[in-house]
Design a protein with these regions (language model features):
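Conserved beta-loop-beta/alpha segment of the NTase-like Rossmann-fold superfamily
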Residues: 1-25, 52-56, 61-67
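Catalytic-core segments of class I nucleotidyltransferases/pyrophosphorylases
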Residues: 29-102, 106-124
Length: 125
């Protein structure tokens, strides 16, 4: 009965990705964008894939509370996770077994890395 589930991955180099912050029991506590992370959070190697599943009604109930009061002045969808947690809702994070399947490209270097992975696996168009 989760209000939302996020797909995460553990990676060797989390640079550029939002970090998954868990409590001592392994429960999701926050998703922190790299540019908003402190030194401790930057050490975390579990990252947000950007894949979310939401209970639609619960998502709609928090969307108007998302603010752009962060370093990028952007509206972050992961803030919906924070608001659901603040409302006492259960939110889960599922860690993908193969991080290659959930990586994204935030810059040309990461795109090249994804292309190299695809080539190594024999994927081409």
């Amino acid at each position: 009965d989760c209000a939302a589930t996020v797909i995460s991955a553990k990676v060797d180099d989390p640079t550029g990705y939002a970090r998954i912050v868990r409590d001592e029991n392994g429960n999701l506590r926050a998703i922190v964008e790299q540019k908003d992370a402190d030194e401790e959070t930057l050490k975390i190697n579990e990252v947000n894939s950007g894949g979310f599943w939401f209970d639609c009604q619960l998502l709609l109930s928090v969307l108007d509370r998302i603010k752009s009061d962060n370093s990028a002045k952007e509206y972050y969808l992961p803030d919906a996770i924070k608001l659901l947690l603040e409302d006492g809702r259960k939110v889960g994070a599922f860690t993908a077994q193969c991080s290659d399947t959930v990586l994204g490209a935030n810059d040309p270097a990461q795109l090249e890395q994804l292309n190299e992975i695809a080539r190594a696996k024999g994927y081409s168009c």
